[in-house]
């Protein structure tokens, strides 16, 4: 049947979850799409984008770039963006387009790091799953990339998963930190909502 769509993106798909995790980590976030997915993320799924500085961009893929898999053009665009913006890392978030053409995310990550000298993450999301799947993949990649060995710090707790998609607000870290402080924790870290990349590097110090 011509025009039959077997898979439709949910209202808050996995790429939105990935962007929500990375929003406050001072990274250069690239949505690997033609333009529509990035607009939905910034316009509807990420309320912090309106009040804080977060470098979220669309890759602006054209038809032939996607069909032919011209990753070198994407890397060139990212390199030019890095000349104008300061970022602690670069993250490329997948959408249905790279899922259909079979983008090699591992190779893309290496190409970006070689071009820019900045750590790069690639998140293999495809736009057909719910936001929590994208969050899970992103947390995993983030901790694999940046967390280092640390001695455990008694009384320290790390909160994973605090995003506006989960809590419906953008100031929930105050409530969460107060709650766990009342439970007896002396150091409460809320990754990605109030606490940045340094907290991720020290994640192993949590009890």
Language-model segments: what does each one mean?
Residues 1-207:
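An N-terminal assembly and electron-transfer interface module characteristic of large anaerobic redox
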């Amino acid at each position: 049947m011509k025009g039959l769509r077997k898979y439709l993106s949910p209202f808050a798909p996995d790429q939105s979850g990935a962007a929500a995790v990375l929003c406050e980590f001072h990274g250069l976030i690239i949505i690997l799409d033609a333009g529509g997915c990035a607009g939905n993320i910034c316009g509807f799924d990420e309320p912090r984008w309106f009040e804080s500085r977060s470098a979220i961009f669309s890759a602006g893929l054209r038809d032939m770039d996607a069909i032919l898999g011209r990753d070198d053009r994407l890397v060139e665009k990212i390199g030019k963006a890095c000349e104008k913006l300061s970022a602690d890392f670069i993250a490329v978030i997948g959408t249905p387009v790279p899922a259909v053409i079979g983008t090699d995310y591992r190779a893309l990550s290496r190409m970006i790091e070689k071009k820019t000298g900045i750590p790069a993450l690639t998140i293999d999301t495809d736009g057909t799953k719910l936001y929590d799947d994208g969050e899970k993949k992103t947390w995993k990649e983030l901790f694999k990339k940046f967390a280092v060995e640390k001695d455990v710090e008694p009384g320290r707790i790390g909160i994973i998963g605090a995003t506006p998609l989960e809590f419906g607000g953008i100031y929930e870290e105050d409530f969460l930190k107060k709650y766990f402080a009342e439970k007896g924790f002396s150091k409460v870290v809320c990754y990605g909502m109030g606490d940045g990349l340094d907290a991720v590097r020290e994640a192993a110090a949590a009890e």
